[in-house]
Amino acid sequence: MAPRAQIQGPLTFGDVAVAFTRIEWRHLDAAQRALYRDVMLENYGNLVSVGLLSSKPKLITQLEQGAEPWTEVREAPSGTHAVEDYWFETKMSALKQSTSEASVLGERTKSVMMEKGLDWEGRSSTEKNYKCKECGKVFKYNSSFISHQRNHTSEKPHKCKECGIAFMNSSSLLNHHKVHAGKQPYRCIECGKFLKKHSTFINHQRIHSREKPHKCIECGKTFRKNSILLSHQRIHTGQKPYKCNDCGKAFAQNAALTRHERIHSGEKPFKCNKCGRAFRDNSTVLEHQKIHTGEKPYQCNECGKAFRKSSTLISHQRMHTGEKPYHCSKCGKSFRYSSSFAGHQKTHSGNKPYQCRDCGKAFTKSSTLTGHQRIHTGEKPYHCKKCGKAFRHSSGLVEHQRLHTGEKPYKCNECGKAFPRSSALKQHKKIHNKERAMKCS
């Protein structure tokens, strides 16, 4: 394509678009047309994201509506078949050099914007970073900052014209267009989800069938995907390849490292839409939301008590069985809960990586730090539904609720007397200890 004169005025979509005539368009096969669509939509999205377009070009409207986007307006001199063939081949060359997410046309957009004193994201070189007021995360580019904020607001401004599904960012919409373009041919009949690869489709179907063909030879636990099995096996081998740059703590899974790093950054991107409380990971906010719904699907067969999480039920059942499966190799002490065991091990190492920014006090566990920080903020997020009393810790609420229910789960083995709190049972046992001491004397 003939070189264009350097653009002096505002950048327009026409400066970075490629136009095909009707004859040229008919020479394109389905894959080439789909590629053209992706490239044009991405270039349009780039210009919109930096505020260089105020109206939607006709070409984009045609693409979104599924119409043929050819035009009779010519950029090239005409007159011979050789010239026309040259122009068509030049246009095709630009498209063939494209990839799914970054195209040669996009590079032209980038170079023109840089000539205007802007970087690829539309910032001048003297502009400052962008900080999110919700979670404190800092972004180099304004477009990344705007896209991130939608995690907090749940805004989905990018809507598919064909099926109506909306997305938070233009890249997700572009990826979704592949469904309609036939680039994601595997459709799940259970939930309607489209998948690009056959292997991904097979793994996805196991969610519905609950098939778990990959078995751990150490403990017998089964998994849907081989990658999850390999990650699980690190529990047995002790391998922890993912290390935190801030405190040096290592993890078996990359996802666990990502969650841990949010402790240092303070980022809590997952927000409860009921009370506004923010969390570091999605699974925690889902569990938290059961507080509002009152859902407790996991019930103890021994006492009938119900729980929001299956893991809490398993831990609770150890009160009935007396099982303490976590043993400290340093001192021989045993624990009912893995969290208690992990916290205990830090007493031997003396490591307290979680420090309060307000008073400097350090803790062995992040959960203890979170609870401690409520002393400074005055936050009491756990409310009793019976009387409205609020507590800093969930354990305080649980103990308080026993006043209303009359539950006394802590029983003395010597006299059978029961108590609502473990501390009350410990205090009571001193009576028996004193009685035994008096008998001995």
From Swiss-Prot:
Q: Which Pfam families match?
A: KRAB, zf-C2H2
Q: Where in the cell is it found?
A: Nucleus
Q: Where are the zinc fingers (C2H2-type)?
A: 130-152, 158-180, 186-208, 214-236, 242-264, 270-292, 298-320, 326-348, 354-376, 382-404, 410-432
Q: Which UniProt keywords apply?
A: DNA-binding, Metal-binding, Nucleus, Repeat, Transcription, Transcription regulation, Zinc, Zinc-finger
Gene3D superfamilies to which the protein is assigned, alphabetical: 6.10.140.140, Classic Zinc Finger
The UniProt record lists the KRAB domain at 11-82
Which InterPro entries does this UniProt record tie to the protein?
KRAB, KRAB_dom_sf, Znf_C2H2-type, Znf_C2H2_sf, Znf_C2H2_type
* Task of the protein: May be involved in transcriptional regulation.
UniProt protein name:
Zinc finger protein 485
Q: What is the lineage of its organism?
A: Eukaryota, Metazoa, Chordata, Craniata, Vertebrata
